[in-house]
């Protein structure tokens, strides 16, 4: 593979990371975005070309070179000379032990065993991918992303590495990149239902990214208030004499004209308010079921599924 493209990809990836975490001024961010576009155009490379990824990031390569140190085994490029039979067998044993630790949710121990396996055989993509799963369980999503990148570099056709990369990126709220990796995973494994489901979730989260005038979380209040159907039904609700009477009583200091003997005004207020809300919801469901489904999608808190990816190899 063209090393110039690998280098260009490493630089583009570094610049993308600086955009997200570099705490740069708006002018500096704009300059970086222009630089990224120029590099992508000049070399025909984008940040989604993960098959160009090296086992180590550009800062890691630089730090190791500046310190005059050799990269640790799990950051080196895959060895040209395959490991001995003894090392391969021991690495498999360590991997199996790591899998057992995952089953009992001892994720730190799993990371340890997978790391030992990598030291003996750093050319095995499965070891990196399994450790990525353990890192994700520990909440170390950056470590998971890094290990998935290494697994993909070793085996660009390894669908599970792309799927786990998508999970880690989703957990970091990097939904644009997550979508790209889920699509690649599906390209390699088209019948995988977990990848299909996770792709839909990532695409939904991407669409539901909060707007500047949005409400709490991903609920877009501005969009809702601009919906003619919603505003029409809300207007009808507020013109309902029962609702007007209820609101008038609440505003005037708690006197409830709808009260009944033996029931406190606050209880009647709550019951009437619930009843009015139910009527409004029923009206919305009958007149605009599409809007109801849209609201449900916005309110529903959904997370990607790791069910298929919990299976260690």
UniProtKB/Swiss-Prot annotation:
Record family assignment: Belongs to the SGT family.
SMART domains per the UniProt record, alphabetical: TPR
Residues with PTM Phosphothreonine: 81, 303
Keyword set includes Cytoplasm: yes
TPR repeat placement: 91-124, 125-158, 159-192
InterPro entries (UniProt xref): SGT, SGTA_dimer, TPR-like_helical_dom_sf, TPR_rpt
Annotated protein name in UniProt: Small glutamine-rich tetratricopeptide repeat-containing protein alpha
Residue positions, PTM Phosphoserine: 77, 84, 301, 305
Task of the protein: Co-chaperone that binds misfolded and hydrophobic patches-containing client proteins in the cytosol. Mediates their targeting to the endoplasmic reticulum but also regulates their sorting to the proteasome when targeting fails. Functions in tail-anchored/type II transmembrane proteins membrane insertion constituting with ASNA1 and the BAG6 complex a targeting module. Functions upstream of the BAG6 complex and ASNA1, binding more rapidly the transmembrane domain of newly synthesized proteins.
Taxonomy, superkingdom: Eukaryota
UniProt GO MF annotations: molecular adaptor activity
Region ranges (Disordered): 69-97
Assigned keywords, A-Z: Acetylation, Chaperone, Cytoplasm, Nucleus, Phosphoprotein, Repeat, TPR repeat
Any one GO biological process: tail-anchored membrane protein insertion into ER membrane
Sites bearing N6-acetyllysine, chain numbering: 137
Signal peptide: none
Location (main, coarse): cytoplasm
Cellular component annotations (GO), alphabetically ordered: membrane; nucleus; TRC complex
Keyword presence, Oxidoreductase: no
Cellular compartments annotated: Cytoplasm; Nucleus
């Amino acid at each position: 593979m063209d090393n110039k493209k690998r280098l260009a990809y490493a630089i583009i990836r570094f610049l993308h990371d600086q955009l997200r975490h570099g705490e740069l001024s708006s002018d500096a961010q704009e300059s970086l975005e222009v630089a990224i576009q120029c590099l992508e155009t000049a070399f025909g490379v984008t940040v989604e070309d993960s098959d160009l990824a090296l086992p180590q990031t550009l800062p890691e390569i630089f730090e190791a070179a500046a310190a005059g140190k050799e990269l640790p085994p799990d950051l080196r490029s895959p060895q040209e000379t395959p490991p001995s039979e003894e090392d391969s067998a021991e690495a498999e044993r360590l991997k199996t032990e790591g899998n057992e630790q995952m089953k009992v949710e001892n994720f730190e121990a799993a990371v340890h065993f997978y790391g030992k396996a990598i030291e003996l055989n750093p050319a095995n993509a499965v070891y990196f991918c399994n450790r990525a799963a353990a890192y994700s369980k520990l909440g170390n999503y950056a470590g998971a992303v890094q290990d998935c990148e290494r697994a993909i570099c070793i085996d660009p056709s390894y669908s599970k590495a792309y799927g786990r990369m998508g999970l880690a990126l989703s957990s970091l709220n990097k939904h644009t990149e997550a979508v790209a990796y889920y699509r690649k995973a599906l390209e390699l494994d088209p019948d995988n239902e977990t990848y299909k489901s996770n792709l839909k979730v990532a695409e939904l989260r991407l669409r539901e990214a909060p707007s500047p005038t949005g409400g709490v979380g991903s609920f877009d209040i501005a969009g809702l208030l601009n919906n003619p159907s919603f505003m029409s039904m809300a207007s009808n609700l507020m013109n309902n004499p029962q609702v007007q009477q209820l609101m008038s009583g609440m505003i005037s200091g708690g006197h409830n004209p709808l009260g009944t003997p033996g029931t406190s005004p606050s209880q009647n207020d709550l019951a009437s308010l619930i009843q009015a809300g139910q009527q409004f919801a029923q009206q919305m469901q009958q007149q605009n079921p599409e809007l109801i489904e849209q609201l449900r999608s916005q309110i529903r808190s959904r997370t990607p599924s790791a069910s298929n990816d919990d299976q260690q190899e």
